[in-house]
Every structure is written in structure tokens, then in C-alpha cells.
Amino acid sequence: DPPNPLTPYATSKACMELLGNQFRNANGLHVVFVRPFYFTGPHHSRRFVIPSIAYQLVKIKYYGAEPIIYSGSLDVSRDIIDVRDVARGMIQILNQADSGEVFNLCCGKSYTIREVVEMMVDIANVSVDFRFDPGYERRNEIPLLIGDPTKAMDIGWKPMISMEDSLTDLFNEMVKRR
């Protein structure tokens, strides 16, 4: 099915695929398309929800910050994958895929932000309250995003880093970065 982007961000990605196909067709370039879903892991920028929460937990645990996590909606669900699995997948796809192919890099399972926060609170071993902050809320938030990794798995790729390990590595890296 052709893409049907629902947000400006998704539209920009669909446009890049169109542009990539034009370059591929006009110049005979080997172009493959990778659609990584939400990814996280060590060194992820605090501008994004999961590392923002990890950073707040570091401040609570190590700096005595008030034990409150501020975030947007905790009920949106995302297919979340570790950045190292994404990097490995991109290399494998580039080396194995035919030009013009499209691959999703995802795990095929969704997690609510609430589930992720609860895992991170366990990792940090702290007690916190949650507060909704409209500054973290996105307009036109899509409540559920989940991908199908079948095509990537058909060439031998699969996510190998568990959500718990990814979040633990992110938290520990944030501790070192503090």
C-alpha cells in the first residue's frame, strides 16, 4: 500500500522516499529505504521522551530533585527498539537488500510510555509521582504506532537488545553523563 502519512513528520519521510526513488531511477543508484520506528538507547538526546524521563530519574536519584516525573500523555503506545539494533539492521539491509526495497526496523510490539516509565523507575530504584505537563504534549498525537518487522527478519535481522537492557544502558549512560 502507498504511504498515508498522518503527521507533518511522517509526510517529510514519505517525501524523502519519493526523492530517493527519483535519484535511484534517474541515476541508477542503489537506494534502499529503512523506516526505523521509535528508537532509544545510550547517548539518546534528552529532547526525546524516554531519555528525558531517564534524565529526570538521574536528577531525582543523584541530586535530590523532587521525586516527580513530568511528561505528556503516558498512554500513547510506541513500537520501541534499541538504537544499536537499528544501526545493525541498517548495515545488514544496505548489504543485502535490492535497490528500491523498503524495510521497517521495529520489534512489532508496542509499549505505552507508562510501561516504559515504570521499567525505568524500577531500574533507577526510586519512588516517584507523575505529573502531566502540557509542554510535553504533541498536537495530533497518534495513540498507537506499531510496525511489522517481517521483511527485515526475512533477510536475517532481528532485534536482539531487550527493552529492559536498552533502558538500563540508557539510564547508566545518563548517570555517567551527569
Label each residue range with its predicted role:
Residues 21-25, 54-55, 95:
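Alpha-helical segments that scaffold the active site and NAD(P)H-binding pocket
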Residues 1-33, 40, 44:
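Catalytic helix-loop patch of NAD(P)-dependent Rossmann-fold dehydrogenases
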Residues 38, 44, 75-78:
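Heptad-repeat alpha-helical coiled-coil signaling segments
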Residues 42-44, 48, 151:
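Short beta-loop-alpha junction of Rossmann-like oxidoreductase domains
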Residues 57-178:
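C-terminal substrate-binding subdomain of Rossmann-fold SDR/epimerase-dehydratase oxidoreductases
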Residues 50-52, 147:
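Short, hinge-like loop/turn segments at secondary-structure boundaries
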Residues 32, 39-40, 49, 86:
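Conserved sequence/active-site signature of Rossmann-fold short-chain dehydrogenase/reductase
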